């Protein structure tokens, strides 16, 4: 039997990168998958890429309560309930010093990266409780376990969802709901490309091209490379499945030992 046979998974930020990779892996493992993203064109492409038979989508803003209620209701209408929630929607914001970051940018990042996750938990946990439990996986980041210069809103948000995860893991324990975070970086995604492009723009003469930044980033990793979205998705599949039945409240790094320390 497939790992997720008979399960229903909701994946936010599902139109590309890690979310799309997880959607494909979850569907291949037997789950019915509802992808959620604000980009409807990319969602349609993701569904065609994965499987029209196993995957549906809802275009929604995950930071708005009515929008979250709408995609939760749609998952229940289509599939009868929710067993797995991958809270993956997130934005990086604009790179800047704290003193130069507009309050509006801070609020925007926190709305998507923290409020959106909290709303998902608020409306999905009751549905999981009706089915006797479930698994929630929240995408954090290496920026959630250490500081990140020029990215204070993003780093703050990724620290915050770890605290949120731990609270949800405690509250969910009585409902049979497990909650964990996955903390990736550097991963070959659109968000990573955006961060690298912004670093080039604000980095003065340190780097000449985005390729220079990518080379330096890969070289700084103990494994000397970027991770791929599929490598992150494989851990998410483990945490979503019953194979991880005693895993809850955990922070799982997918970073090629970047946060482990220095090699020399």
PLM segments and residue spans:
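Short C-terminal tail/terminal secondary-structure segment
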Residues: 3, 92-95, 236-237, 248-264
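Substrate-binding pocket helix/loop in short-chain dehydrogenase/reductase
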Residues: 96-98, 102-108, 217
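Residue(s) in the substrate-gating loop at a strand-loop-helix junction
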Residues: 141
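Alpha-helical segment proximal to the catalytic Tyr-Lys
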Residues: 126, 170-171, 245
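Short, small/polar-rich loop/turn modules that mediate ligand/substrate recognition or access, typified
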Residues: 173, 178, 247-249
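Active-site helix of classical SDR
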Residues: 121, 157, 165
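Canonical Rossmann dinucleotide-binding motif of NAD(H)/NADP(H)-dependent dehydrogenases/reductases
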Residues: 3-34
């Amino acid at each position: 039997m497939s790992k997720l046979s008979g399960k229903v998974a909701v994946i936010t930020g599902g139109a590309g990168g890690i979310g799309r990779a997880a959607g494909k892996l979850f569907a291949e493992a037997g789950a019915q998958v509802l992808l959620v993203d604000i980009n409807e064109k990319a969602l349609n492409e993701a569904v065609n890429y994965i499987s029209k038979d196993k995957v549906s989508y809802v275009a929604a803003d995950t930071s708005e309560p009515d929008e979250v209620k709408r995609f939760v209701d749609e998952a229940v209408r289509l599939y009868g309930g929710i067993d797995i929630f991958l809270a993956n929607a997130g934005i990086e914001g604009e790179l800047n010093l704290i003193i130069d970051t507009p309050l509006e940018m801070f609020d925007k990042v926190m709305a998507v990266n923290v409020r959106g996750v909290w709303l998902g938990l608020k409306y999905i946990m009751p549905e999981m409780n009706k089915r006797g439990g479930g698994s929630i996986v929240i995408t954090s980041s290496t920026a959630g376990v250490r500081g990140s210069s020029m990215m204070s809103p993003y780093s703050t948000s990724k620290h915050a969802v770890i605290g949120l995860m731990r609270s949800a893991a405690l509250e969910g324990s009585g409902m049979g709901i497990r909650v964990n975070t996955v903390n990736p970086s550097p991963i070959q995604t659109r968000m990573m490309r955006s961060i690298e492009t912004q670093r080039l723009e604000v980095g003065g003469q340190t780097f000449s091209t985005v390729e220079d930044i990518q080379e330096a980033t890969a070289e700084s990793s103990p494994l000397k490379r970027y991770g791929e979205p599929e490598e992150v998705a494989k851990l998410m599949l483990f945490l979503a499945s019953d194979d991880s039945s005693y895993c809850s409240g955990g922070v799982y790094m997918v970073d090629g030992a970047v946060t482990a320390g220095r090699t020399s």
